[in-house]
Swiss-Prot record:
It catalyses: L-tryptophan + FADH2 + chloride + O2 = 7-chloro-L-tryptophan + FAD + 2 H2O. Its EC number is 1.14.19.9. Involved in the biosynthesis of kutznerides, actinomycete-derived antifungal and antimicrobial cyclic hexadepsipeptides. Together with KtzR, catalyzes the regiospecific dichlorination of L-tryptophan (L-Trp) to produce 6,7-dichloro-L-tryptophan. KtzQ catalyzes the chlorination of L-Trp at C7 position to yield 7-chlorotryptophan. Can also use 6-chloro-L-tryptophan as substrate and form 6,7-dichloro-L-tryptophan, but has a preference for halogenation at the 7 position of unmodified L-Trp. Cannot use piperazic acid or gamma,delta-dehydropiperazic acid. FAD binds at G14, T16, A17, A40, E50, A51, L363. The lineage of its organism: Bacteria, Bacillati, Actinomycetota, Actinomycetes, Pseudonocardiales. Keywords: FAD, Flavoprotein, Nucleotide-binding, Oxidoreductase. The gene is ktzQ. This is Tryptophan 7-halogenase KtzQ. Pfam families: Trp_halogenase. SUPFAM superfamilies: FAD/NAD(P)-binding domain.
Length: 533
């Protein structure tokens, strides 16, 4: 029998996507496959931080056998227990602190990790909506149903000093340090070959398959499978394979970002255990806390503001002089390749797809795509069904996220600028419009396969197929003030069940008090982790 096994893989591009690809594929396929990374010699970069989601460690670092504390120390990492949305309901310029809503409450809400508790076969969100819409409570959804918001307010750690986990969390870190760490791990532990050179062109056979890539120094690097991690340039997928790019600007308007890094006094003001998403005149800004500094960037639409205007608004928010700052200006295309796998080329990361980092899905798209690639891994025959199924999986992953992000803008009550008014004119995709109608009718939207965080975040196959769940939709929709039109009708016939839900809400309040009394500050925990003091 002929040996049709893939024997060699060439990854074009380094960065987080390239080195994640090299590590994951080398680990998954073992020493029988030679993995090479072709990376242009490094240039100086402005480091602005990266935010992630909870399954990163289980799906990627655990798979590689790298302990959490080890990679965190190497990558200047801190914890992220939520995304806090600030000023998404009130008009005005970018502001780092919450304004007051008309009801007197501060204009912020939290998108939290972990699944909602259930009561009598319904998620707690439906009981909260019943109480809220019947005037029985005015407490916000996030603070009624989750224990974390009070920890966030007090800048407390999601782990005890002995490492015990108190709540679901993800991470903030320096993305360039992660890429450097994975490069060392790949070369030293997995025998990945690292070639520093500049790509010039690719060779194709009569079938249109890539046979080799060529470099400025005259190298010819042959392989059986090629992974395109060349970023927005999409060198192999877009230029060599000529795969069409599906523009998604009819759903999401933002197409630019201006970013900078600023100092932060951790001892004086503490370290926030969350990513901040701060609404601006023509988009939004992130704030990613790192040790001794934080990264911030204004993601905006060039239809409604200029690069200079965006930089000025960002600097006003942080009370710094634009003339004294070094900015990283980024133009990005919103959308995805029609297919991420064409013949013997697979695009991973930004070369395949991109949405703005509003929900920290950038790295997730990379390692989720790698998971699906290994699941559908080919041999040299490259049977079309493998690529077809992979392409359907990653397209659905992208489209679901695109729709969820669009709702953040479309359902916001803000209408104080051309940008916010324009967002409301964009149509939802048909499938997502149905989800919005389900929510308006009081129904749960996309129930999770389990509410046990250990099993939910521990079973990536189930999580991948059920990624944005009812908990996510309620955090954002209710947080924006977009409530169901009426409670779930069946609860009107079950008053006893509604009454019996009160102890569940009370248990959330008790657990919150317990955590506040025991959790260390983020600053104290990270000092012990990174400095051993």
């Amino acid at each position: 029998m002929d040996d049709n096994r893939i024997r060699s893989i060439l990854v074009l591009g380094g960065g987080t996507a390239g080195w994640m690809s090299a590590c994951y594929l080398s680990k998954a396929l073992g020493p029988g496959v030679e993995v090479t990374v072709l990376e242009a010699p490094s240039i100086s970069r402005i480091r602005v931080g990266e935010a992630t989601i909870p399954n990163l460690h289980k799906v990627f670092f655990d798979f590689l056998g790298i302990a959490e504390d080890e990679w965190m120390r190497e990558c200047n990492a801190s914890y992220k227990a939520a995304v806090r949305f600030v000023n998404w309901r009130t008009p005005g310029d970018g502001q780092a602190t919450p304004r007051r809503r008309p009801d007197g409450r501060p204009d912020h809400f939290d998108h939290l990790f972990g699944q909602l508790p259930e009561h009598e076969n319904l998620p707690l969100s439906q009981y909260w909506a019943h109480r809220r819409l019947n005037g029985l409570t005015d407490e916000p959804f996030d603070r009624s149903c989750y224990v974390q918001p009070e920890l966030l307010d007090r800048k407390l750690s999601p782990r005890l000093m002995d490492g015990t986990k108190l709540a679901s969390y993800a991470w903030h870190f320096d993305a360039d340090l992660v890429a450097d760490f994975l490069c060392r791990f790949a070369v030293q532990k997995l025998n990945v070959t690292h070639v520093q050179d500049v790509f010039t062109h690719a060779d194709l056979d009569q079938r249109g398959h890539i046979t080799a890539v060529n470099t400025e120094s005259g190298r010819t690097l042959a392989a059986d499978l090629f992974i395109d991690c060349s970023g927005f340039r999409s060198v192999l997928m877009g230029k060599v394979m000529q795969e069409p790019f599906l523009d998604m600007s009819k759903h999401l308007l933002n197409d630019r970002a201006v970013a900078l890094m600023l100092p932060h006094d951790d001892e004086k003001v503490g370290i926030e255990p969350y990513t901040s998403s701060l609404a601006m005149r023509s988009g939004w800004s992130w704030k990613i806390p790192l040790l001794g500094r934080f990264g911030s960037g204004y993601v905006y639409s060039s239809q409604f503001t200029s690069q200079d205007e965006a930089a000025e608004e960002l600097c006003r928010m942080w009370d710094v002089d634009p003339a004294e700052q070094t900015f990283n200006n980024v133009r990005f295309r919103v959308g995805r390749s029609r297919r991420a796998w064409v013949r013997n080329c697979v695009a991973i990361g930004v070369s395949a797809m991109f949405v703005e980092p509003l929900e920290s899905t950038g790295l997730y798209f990379s390692y989720a795509s790698l998971y699906q690639l290994v699941k559908h891994f080919p041999d040299k025959r490259f049977r079309p069904i493998l690529a077809d199924r992979f392409n359907r999986e990653v397209a659905t992953m992208y489209d679901d996220t695109r729709d969820f992000l669009q709702a953040h803008f479309s359902l916001s009550p803000r209408d104080d600028s051309e940008f916010w008014r324009a967002c409301k004119e964009l149509p939802f995709a048909d499938g997502f419009a149905e989800k919005v109608e389900m929510y308006r009718a009081g129904l749960p939207v996309e129930l999770p396969v389990t509410i046990d965080d250990g099993h939910y975040y521990g079973n990536f196959e189930a999580e991948f197929r059920n990624f944005w769940t009812n908990s996510n939709y309620y955090c954002i929709f209710a947080g924006l003030g977009f409530l169901p039109e009426h409670p779930l009708p069946v609860l009107e016939f079950r008053p006893e069940a509604v009454d019996r839900a009160e102890p569940v809400f009370a248990a959330v309040r008790r657990r919150t008090e317990e955590l506040v009394a025991t959790a260390p500050t983020m600053q104290a925990y990270l000092r012990r982790l990174h400095q051993g003091t």
